[in-house]
Amino acid sequence: LDEILPVAEALTRALREHPACERAEVAGSIRRRTDTCKDVDLVAASDDPLALTAAIAEHRTIAEHGTPSELGVKLTTHSGIGVDVRIVPPPAFGNLLQHFSGSAAHNAELRERAVAAGLHVSEHGIKDDATGETELFTTEEEVYRRLGYDYIEPELREDRGELDAARDGSLPRLVELDDVRGELHCHTTLSDGTGTIEEMAAAARDRGYEYLAITDHSASHGFGDNVSAERLWQRIEEIEAFNASDPGIRVLAGSEVNILPEGGLDYPDDLLAALDWVIASIHTSF
C-alpha cells in the first residue's frame, strides 16, 4: 500500500486538474486501505470522457496504455504498476465509486440482498425490477441509503457483517490518528536510534501521547549496536528514574528481542519478565 498509494494519488491529481474532469477518486483495494494492492483503480466523472482518458494516457508516469475510450483506459506505469481508469457521466459517479471500491465479496452480498428486494445494483445504477427504472446517484451515501443501509466506510467493506451493522445502525467508528494514545516500538541512541530517552519522550508528549515504549535492539540481532543483558538492566533503572521525575508521559521499558536460530530469545527469562513490553523479531538465520 505504501508503494502504490503515491502513484494513485499522483494520477488522481492529474485527473482532477484536467478541465474535463468534474470528480475523481481512488477506488479499489487502495481506497479500502488493504495491506497489499495489485493495481490502481481510479474513477472519474466527466461530460467529455474521451478528452480525459486521452490526457491521462499521456501522463509522465505512464509507460504503456490501451486505446482511450469514453468508458476509460488501461495504463501501465514505468514501474510496472497496472492502472484501470473508469469514467461515467457525473450523475452516476456514486454508483461507479461504490462498485469499483469493492470488495468483490462485499459487492456480491450487496447485490444478492438487493435482488431479494427486487433491485439490481451495478456501476450503471440501481434498477427497480417492478418499474424497470434505473436510478443514478452522485454519491455513495445515496446508493447505500437507497438500499436501506447507513453509509459504510470503504475500510469496512470486506463482507464481515458490515451490511447487517449498516442496516441496524451499529457500524463501528474508524480509528483515527487522534485516537492513538502511544507508541510501542521505537529505538534510541542505545542501539540504532538517533534520540535519547528524554528526546523521544518529549517528541511523544508533543504528539499528545500518554505512553512510549523504548524497544532498542537486543544482544544479537546482527546489525551492530547490540545491547547486552547487563546494559538493558541499567536501562530499566534509567527509565524508572526518568518516570519518577514526572515527565508528563509514561515511558515503558522494552526491547526488540532477537529470535535465535533454535527458537529461543537472546535474553534470559528473568530479564524479559522485568520488561514492560517485549517485541520478538526475526532478523537473521531464517
What name fits each language-model region?
Residues 50-176:
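Acidic, metal-coordinating catalytic segment for phosphate/diphosphate chemistry
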